[in-house]
Amino acid sequence: MKIIVQKFGGTSVKDDKGRKLALGHIKEAISEGYKVVVVVSAMGRKGDPYATDSLLGLLYGDQSAISPREQDLLLSCGETISSVVFTSMLLDNGVKAAALTGAQAGFLTNDQHTNAKIIEMKPERLFSVLANHDAVVVAGFQGATEKGDTTTIGRGGSDTSAAALGAAVDAEYIDIFTDVEGVMTADPRVVENAKPLPVVTYTEICNLAYQGAKVISPRAVEIAMQAKVPIRVRSTYSNDKGTLVTSHHSSKVGSDVFERLITGIAHVKDVTQFKVPAKIGQYNVQTEVFKAMANAGISVDFFNITPSEIVYTVAGNKTETAQRILMDMGYDPMVTRNCAKVSAVGAGIMGVPGVTSKIVSALSEKEIPILQSADSHTTIWVLVHEADMVPAVNALHEVFELSK
């Protein structure tokens, strides 16, 4: 049985126009001899009646007494409704289709409600239904515990659902349909001449996603990479095959992946930088501070440690809490709000001299101050003022000639 997984997000399934475009992609796959496992998100975005955020808004405020287990019962409804509506549309258009919930499709998760982890896939029922249908529509974002409690698997969960299904059924491709032409060299809303990339590696797309590119969930990429199932990031509104995400840039197995220096530029805004000076005679400031942040549920990013101070960033909405904790501990932090993290990602930078110099020079020419920097084997990050984010992203996109 030749299987393809196709995932359609909220904007693709929110109305009849989007669903009909999705229908075209499904029929094309069927005509190519595939059985199609369709994964759908809830219909629309916040403000639309069945979107996840809209359902969450039905609860009585942020401090609702409802348990996470009960929240999952509510949150999973959006995808369940979407799967049935989508299946009805397929049937009305001559596609032999059936709908399954995440649990029915074999998603077994732990009991970490609202952010559950998939611990096993049991696709036997899915295979059975697929044998007698052209397409099976699976509600994304959801699963169930061994006790049968409904769970949801966190933000980006429908991407993760598609990847887990692709791995479980040994799909030829996992198609992630979005509203753009594939993985872009930068956010096209920030860089007008951003270009779609024909091929990226799993590592590159993971890094782009973790650094702010919202085209696909990094959890989904990690699952597909482990199973060695290629992903295609495609546009719902086009017949183009989009961006292929695989283990290497070239179709030639064993070829070098370093022919492209920088793959893309990503960014994250609304970041706050903290500089925490060490107390006199104190040598473990980072241990004390990071432990306090973790205990408060604050994720620490982009940190540098010196004998005299530690520097790190937090999400903007955690600023007040983080500052209060530090002051209660007797520290007097220097706080810089309204920052942005700009990242240059590419497998080709590993061991190549001059890349950081090129970034520094490009930003200096635009008179953009760098507040902090760091690097890894495949990514170089800089922290800038948020007001400088757009010119910084454009400067790096230009200096690495990503529009060519």
From Swiss-Prot:
Classification via InterPro entries: AceGlu_kinase-like_sf, ACT-like_dom_sf, ACT_dom, Asp/Glu/Uridylate_kinase, Asp_kin_monofn, Asp_kinase, Aspartate_kinase_CS, CASTOR_ACT_dom
Site description Contribution to the catalysis, residues in chain: 7, 79
Inhibition and activation profile: Diaminopimelate-sensitive.
UniProt entry tagged with the keyword ATP-binding: yes
A GO biological-process term: homoserine biosynthetic process
Reactions catalysed, as given in the entry: L-aspartate + ATP = 4-phospho-L-aspartate + ADP
Underlying gene: dapG
Family matches, as Pfam families: AA_kinase, ACT_7
Function field: Catalyzes the phosphorylation of the beta-carboxyl group of aspartic acid with ATP to yield 4-phospho-L-aspartate, which is involved in the branched biosynthetic pathway leading to the biosynthesis of amino acids threonine, isoleucine and methionine.
One GO CC term on file: cytosol
UniProt domain ACT: residue ranges: 344-404
Binding site for ATP: 7-10, 41, 178-179, 184-189
Residues at which substrate binds: 25-30, 52-54, 79, 130-131, 155-158, 299-301, 355-356, 369-370, 376-377
UniProt lineage: Bacteria, Bacillati, Bacillota, Bacilli, Bacillales
EC number(s) stated in the UniProt entry for this protein: 2.7.2.4
Pathway info: Amino-acid biosynthesis; L-lysine biosynthesis via DAP pathway; (S)-tetrahydrodipicolinate from L-aspartate: step 1/4; Amino-acid biosynthesis; L-methionine biosynthesis via de novo pathway; L-homoserine from L-aspartate: step 1/3; Amino-acid biosynthesis; L-threonine biosynthesis; L-threonine from L-aspartate: step 1/5
Any one GO molecular function term: ATP binding
Top-rank EC class of the record's enzyme: transferase
UniProt keyword Hydrolase present: no
Protein name: Aspartokinase 1
Organism in which the protein naturally occurs: Bacillus subtilis (strain 168)
Record's keyword terms, sorted: Amino-acid biosynthesis, ATP-binding, Diaminopimelate biosynthesis, Kinase, Lysine biosynthesis, Nucleotide-binding, Transferase
